[in-house]
C-alpha cells in the first residue's frame, strides 16, 4: 500500500464585467511539480526523479465574451509551460509548452439556445513518467462542439 502526493497548485483569477454587454477574464496558475512524491514504501529513486526532472510551471488563461442582443461571441487564449525539465531544455521556440485558443458563438431564440464552439491546442510532449524525454510527440488538437438547449 502506498500514497501519492500530486503537485501543488495556486490560482489567481480576475474579471472585469462591462455591464450586460460583456466581460474579460484572466486566470494565472502556478504549479509545483517537484513536490510530487510516493510514500509508504521504498520510492526514493522515483521521488528523486520528480525533484530532478520536473519543474515549477506557470499557466495563463485569458477569455472574453460579448453580447449583441441575442447573439453571444466568445474567445480565449491559453498558455501552459511543460513541467518536464528535459523538455524545457530540449524544446525550441517554446514548442514544448501548451498553447491554444478557443472561439464560440451562441444565439438565444427565446426558448431555444444554439451554441457552437471551436478549440485548438498545440503542444509537444516528451513522454515517460520515470524517464522524461524518451519519446517526443507533437500534437495539434482541434475540437468542434455544438449544443442545443430547449427550455420547457
Where are these regions (language model features)?
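Outer-membrane beta-barrel porins/channels
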Residues: 1-152
